């Protein structure tokens, strides 16, 4: 019987698909899972496909003078724009911009994709984390163990909920929280573990779950950069997502979601997300307070259209990451840079490399000035190094050795679905030249 390569829109299967399309695996049949996230794939995928030509329209040696890091006018492809405009013509005449049928449909579709019983769509990923913590029973002063190298929204959600962030070190290879450091930080006040799937890399959730069970802690995962990860939500009490336009899957505004298999938790999340009201009862409060944090019906309608491209867009990210890793291997082998590992537990929200701390600023400047290539340090200030009164009072003297070293070395290269291979060639050409000729490592 011929073996199959299943296309599910998840990271593990995308890796198998990449190997199949590159010819690394022979004699397997492609099977496209019947899912909204694969809808665009069905239109472009064939048994034999030239990835560079069919997905990227690659024209080798086409001259490129400027490479933006993340251009806002290319967050949505032209095909998606057309689909979204068609949807808006259906929604706008109804006047149902906030509540409406698309919201419920969006939650059901996302629930099916995530293999979670309940999904509550929210107005942002930040609100999703905050509501999730409160639904799990966070009380003022409860400690939440988390990394310090995430976007400030993660810590802000904890602080706004009354929790106390406890920052621990990361695994420097993955940029994700180190489970061994979690155990060292547990105190009688610890109630939660909040791992972040930073840059799209899945944290070591199985290990984290084991620690949580041992100490009777709750796990709420920040998967705002991790939609499409295989086994997402498997080891967490609550999974939170962001649909900011800059994410792997976004709407045309701010939105997010909470996912769980626990009915009681889902009920509480719904209550907290809409003013504390009892579910399906008009304006009757059943908890002390709640927020105005439901996703808008209009954004849900847009989300349903954009979800059709999720599998394809995440595959493009994987292909681009693989291309970087393969073609920049020489620089890594000579010790000039450190590349991330290509793995089946990554959805490549960002592409981080490491360079020598003392060279980073020069590399970024020369790439931009000499090759027109924009790079970035996406989160320039670590949470425990902010200059706020709280940080200076509570975290003064805190040292996170691996977090701080990785942060001083990290440099993000452009990577997004509308990124062209010609642009990527320009990035790599510039990086080779600057590091080998200009920096003189």
Swiss-Prot record:
The record lists pyridoxal 5'-phosphate as bound by 125-126, 225, 242, 292
Q: One Pfam family of this protein, by short name?
A: NtdA_N
Q: Which residues form a coiled coil?
A: none
Give an example GO molecular function.
Answer: pyridoxal phosphate binding
* Cofactor requirement: pyridoxal 5'-phosphate
Q: Extract the SUPFAM superfamilies matched here.
A: PLP-dependent transferases
Q: Which residues carry this modification: N6-(pyridoxal phosphate)lysine?
A: 247
Entry-linked InterPro entries: DegT/StrS_aminotransferase, NtdA_N, PyrdxlP-dep_Trfase, PyrdxlP-dep_Trfase_major, PyrdxlP-dep_Trfase_small
Gene3D superfamilies with a match to the protein in the record: Aspartate Aminotransferase, domain 1, Type I PLP-dependent aspartate aminotransferase-like (Major domain)
Annotated family: Belongs to the DegT/DnrJ/EryC1 family.
Job of this protein: Involved in the biosynthesis of kanosamine (3-amino-3-deoxy-D-glucose), which is known to have antibiotic and antifungal properties, and to be a precursor of the antibiotic neotrehalosadiamine (3,3'-diamino-3,3'-dideoxy-alpha,beta-trehalose (NTD)). Catalyzes the reversible pyridoxal phosphate-dependent transamination of 3-dehydro-alpha-D-glucose 6-phosphate to form alpha-D-kanosamine-6-phosphate. It can only use alpha-anomer and glutamate is the only amino donor.
Supply any other comment.
Answer: The production of neotrehalosadiamine is dormant in the wild-type strain. A mutation in the beta subunit of RNA polymerase activates the production of the neotrehalosadiamine.
State the oligomer form and interacting partners: Homodimer.
Protein name, as recorded: 3-oxo-glucose-6-phosphate:glutamate aminotransferase
User: What's the source species for this entry?
Assistant: Bacillus subtilis (strain 168)
